């Protein structure tokens, strides 16, 4: 399945950290965490497909689809190295 163009937010500077929210949440659930880390890290939070401001794409979704979406966003932002923080998947 093709990846979707996920809605995302970038704050701060430094090593890249992608924040992946849980099912039923959205990128803004990471706002408080990013606020505390943005002085030392580039914080990238994004809405999973079908959540928040991201399009739904084609149902059903698989874990591979969600990984493909993250990889597409990583490439779009030209990020070579990254850390990933997530919960509830």
Spans of model-derived segments:
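A short loop-to-beta-strand scaffold at the N-terminal edge of the catalytic core in hydrolase folds
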Residues: 1-10
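Alpha-helical elements of Rossmann-like donor-binding domains used by nucleotide-donor carbohydrate transfer enzymes
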Residues: 7, 32, 36, 65-72
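Active-site loop/oxyanion-hole signature of alpha/beta-hydrolase fold enzymes
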Residues: 44, 48-89
């Amino acid at each position: 399945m093709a990846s979707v163009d996920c809605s995302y937010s970038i704050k701060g500077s430094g090593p890249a950290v992608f924040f992946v929210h849980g099912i039923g949440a959205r990128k803004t659930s990471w706002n408080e965490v990013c606020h505390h880390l943005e002085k030392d890290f580039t914080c990238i939070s994004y809405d999973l497909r079908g959540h928040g401001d991201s399009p739904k794409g084609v149902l059903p979704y698989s874990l591979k689809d969600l990984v493909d979406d993250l990889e597409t966003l990583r490439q779009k932002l030209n990020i070579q190295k990254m850390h990933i923080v997530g919960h509830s998947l």
